[in-house]
Amino acid sequence: MNKILFIFTLFFSSGFFTFAVSADKNPGSENMTNTIGPHDRGGSSPIYNILNSYLTAYNGSHHLYDRMSFLCLSSQNTLNGACPSSDAPGTATIDGETNITLQFTEKRSLIKRELQIKGYKQFLFKNANCPSKLALNSSHFQCNREQASGATLSLYIPAGELNKLPFGGVWNAVLKLNVKRRYDTTYGTYTINITVNLTDKGNIQIWLPQFKSNARVDLNLRPTGGGTYIGRNSVDMCFYDGYSTNSSSLEIRFQDDNSKSDGKFYLKKINDDSKELVYTLSLLLAGKNLTPTNGQALNINTASLETNWNRITAVTMPEISVPVLCWPGRLQLDAKVKNPEAGQYMGNIKITFTPSSQTL
């Protein structure tokens, strides 16, 4: 594809500009990709340009491109964009913009949402300045009786529109527009692949379905003979990255409140901190067995985790209007102690979860 360079020379005294295009461009089918973001749901949602005055055709020696239009494949089906699929009747020139309803699909969950895209065209004239925004299916447009030598196309997502996406994730859409010369010639189709990388950092969390807040777990120590006591319990959890499990890596850190640096986990006797019981942790995460060390991070490449629907769970969280995907885990606590002193023992574990989406 030719590289097109616009050079504008402004003449403020006369009130118009002239322009030069370094090469003519013939219209035809094009494939384009536009990636938006990362954008966080907690922030404002500004205008995002998909195409900004994109040169679709130009020829300084003729006016064959004076009636170009850009039409959706359907006026109803939003899969590739719904907007007028035929030219406006008659010779009416429609000022303004065209609304396009486009379906976006989240990569992991396959949940779908529709967003509004706005588009307009502008014709280019060799010796006149008429930068009017025109609807994509409007008729040809003359400027001071001069016919256009080419046209540009602009597409954008309006401010606030991304707020319609209900949760973080990788949202994909494919917009297709037929490129025509009004009534008689179809030059080709523009295929525009759009990806919105949407994070939800304010909702990154470890979800504990059995508990409304912090978990309280009893190790259930019981004697097995010979002065030995064993105990076991587990806590179900789901790790939500605010990005529909699209994070490339996870860091999980388990740390208790003791001052030792031996990597072990301890329970302390209530009213007598000198008496301690050692216990161990094991984490089953999306089918992978992990052994946490006190205070040390577990660094997990998510490519090593199973990603079938048995390993990624949809859960409903109070802060989010629809079910979201998270990595399911089960934390198991085990203790085996010899001749423990009678009494109540207590400990705390702080779990820190940092997915790669946190730093996007």
Curated annotation (Swiss-Prot):
UniProt keyword RNA-binding, yes or no: no
**Compartments reported by the entry:** Fimbrium
Q: Which UniProt keywords apply?
A: Fimbrium, Plasmid
Q: Main localization of the protein?
A: other
Question: What single Pfam family name could you report for this chain, choosing any that match?
Answer: CblD
Q: Which InterPro entries match?
A: CblD, CfaE_adhesin
Query: Could you give one GO CC term from the UniProt record?
Result: pilus
**Has UniProt tagged this entry with the keyword DNA damage?**
no
Identification of the protein by name: CFA/I fimbrial subunit E
| Gene assigned in the entry | cfaE
